[in-house]
Amino acid sequence: MRIEQIKQIVKQYQNGTSAPLGVAFKDLKTGTTVLAHADEPFPTASAYKIYILAELYRKAYAGECSLNDRYPLTDAVKSIGSGVLEQLDAGLNLTLNDYATLMMIISDNTATDFLFNFLGRENIKHNVIDYLGLSQTKCDWGCNKLIDVYYGMNGRNFQQLWEDNGGRSPSYHNSKWYQCITDENNQTAPCEAMKMLELLYRGKWVNREASEGMLNIMKQCQTNSRIPHLLPPGIVVAHKTGSLDK
């Protein structure tokens, strides 16, 4: 597909929505880009998990931990939303690599919150976001906090929230967090996410082995109804999706 075709597709989608469409596309062979609102912040939902994975691999390859280190699953870290660990019994002894794999391939929120707490918010900010100069990127919350803030859960589960809202999903689209105008949030800009992905492709996040390790996990992503969905069979895609609703 030619660059001009990609530009037309982006324009078509942008014309079909009243919301800004954020796009950052780069041909890594030629350096040619297609950009739309690429420097503006957007809420990431689960797409922010790639920055958590980046800090985990930095920490492991710095010798501060091993991906084979085991930590038990606890009830305290369980998060609502996507994944399977929330439904499993506490005490399950998982490696850091297990948590990372679940976080990335099925977007497990509990695995994410374990790693977010294990690594530390400030370390993710300092060692990844600030280090790469990602001025529009924030990874301030684990998944449980993100869901609580965006949806106003206040201790309720999704069924209670649904019933309290008259059988409808609550709207957060006009919230200040969704508009990315708050001091704390989980957000990124398309061009900044593209920068992270290009570093992985070129083997320049930590080193080639670490970059390839991250990509190998991302190639196993099971939410394949989006980016890979309309691509020809056999195309290998390393990616991470994110959704605030369905």
Predicted regions and their residues:
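Small-residue-rich helix-loop
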Residues: 132, 214-223, 234
